[in-house]
């Protein structure tokens, strides 16, 4: 059976057909509409899936935000242009006439990355560092979603009580500092207004402020990982997302994690499925993989 998998992120929407063998084909992308109106996201999803839906038997959606009863509830509305709520499953079933499921994108990615691990691993955590910071936790071989869908939203744990206000309403969240949006928001002077991609480019060219911003992000993530190790005693942490997979970033995180006491060290791995982990994880869950 073929699954039409959809990944809704803060920057882009992706869709692909995924067979029972896990092979991805006909992958497509569109920019995520920066709009508070549900109609804008519905129209973008319609354009994304219409060329693919005739070739699928079901739909699996991985989306940023809390997924509860098939709907998206934005914990940080800024990541979706201010959109607060969207009925994912209902909308995709209306658009495609196919049975649909929805799950948080980082939770889905965690499940895909867990399947790719070698060795006797039962406990792992996936972290995505992109427009925002999200996560997924596998404990005892089971994916944790939580009764309200909040499990794994580690980007909204405290990093700095005197830090910037996060879009979720808290002050000093990891996401407000370490994410691509957080990196860009802290830029000053000639870097003010630059996006994270530009800041990474400038850092590679030797720009001191750009390098400091990226180090600040990596140091914040390393401290988060130490906290995660203390909380879950996971066997490894897998890092993905556009920032997490940027050249040289994971090495910085490893450097800062090494400065923590040894009890909080844990193996760090780059995401095996790169930017397709959310799509694949959603498809796996739609195929009936047990949580």
From Swiss-Prot:
EC number(s) from the headed UniProt entry: 2.7.1.60
Keyword Translocase on entry: no
Coiled coil: none
One function term, GO molecular function aspect: N-acylmannosamine kinase activity
Pfam family, one: ROK
UniProt-listed InterPro entries: ATPase_NBD (IPR043129), ManNAc_kinase_bac (IPR023945), ROK (IPR000600), ROK_cs (IPR049874)
Binding-site positions, Zn(2+): 156, 166, 168, 173
GO terms of biological process kind: N-acetylneuraminate catabolic process
Pathway assigned in UniProt: Amino-sugar metabolism; N-acetylneuraminate degradation; D-fructose 6-phosphate from N-acetylneuraminate: step 2/5
Catalytic activity: an N-acyl-D-mannosamine + ATP = an N-acyl-D-mannosamine 6-phosphate + ADP + H(+)
Positions of ATP binding: 5-12, 132-139
UniProtKB keywords: ATP-binding, Carbohydrate metabolism, Kinase, Metal-binding, Nucleotide-binding, Transferase, Zinc
Record's subunit section: Homodimer.
Function: Catalyzes the phosphorylation of N-acetylmannosamine (ManNAc) to ManNAc-6-P.
PANTHER family membership: N-ACETYLMANNOSAMINE KINASE (PTHR18964:SF169), ROK (REPRESSOR, ORF, KINASE) FAMILY (PTHR18964)
Protein family: Belongs to the ROK (NagC/XylR) family. NanK subfamily.
Name the UniProt record assigns to this protein: N-acetylmannosamine kinase
Lineage, highest ranks first: Bacteria, Pseudomonadati, Pseudomonadota, Gammaproteobacteria, Enterobacterales
């Amino acid at each position: 059976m073929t699954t039409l998998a959809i990944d809704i992120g803060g920057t882009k929407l992706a869709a692909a057909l995924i067979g029972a063998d896990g092979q991805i084909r006909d992958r497509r992308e569109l920019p995520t509409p920066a709009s508070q109106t549900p109609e804008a996201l519905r129209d973008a999803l319609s354009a994304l899936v219409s060329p693919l839906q005739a070739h699928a038997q079901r739909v699996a959606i991985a989306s940023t935000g809390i997924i509860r009863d098939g709907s998206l509830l934005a914990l940080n509305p800024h990541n979706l242009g201010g959109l607060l709520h969207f009925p994912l499953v209902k909308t995709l079933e209306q658009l495609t006439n196919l049975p649909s499921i929805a799950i948080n994108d980082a939770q889905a990615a965690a499940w895909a990355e867990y399947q790719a691990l070698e060795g006797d691993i039962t406990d792992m955590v996936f972290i995505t560092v992109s427009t925002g910071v999200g996560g997924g936790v596998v404990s005892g071989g089971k994916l944790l979603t939580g009764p309200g869908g909040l499990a794994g939203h580690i980007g909204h744990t405290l990093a700095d009580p005197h830090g910037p206000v996060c879009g979720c309403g808290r002050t000093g969240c990891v996401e407000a500092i370490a994410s691509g949006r957080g990196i860009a928001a802290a830029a000053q002077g000639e870097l003010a207004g630059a996006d994270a991609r530009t800041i990474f480019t400038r850092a590679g060219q030797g720009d001191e402020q750009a390098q400091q911003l990226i180090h600040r992000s990596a140091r914040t993530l390393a401290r988060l990982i130490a906290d995660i190790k203390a909380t879950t005693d996971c066997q490894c942490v897998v890092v993905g997302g556009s920032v997490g997979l940027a050249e040289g970033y994971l090495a910085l995180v490893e450097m800062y994690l090494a400065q923590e006491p040894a009890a909080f060290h844990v193996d760090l791995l780059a995401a095996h499925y790169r930017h397709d982990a959310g799509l694949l994880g959603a498809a796996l869950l739609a195929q009936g993989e047990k949580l």
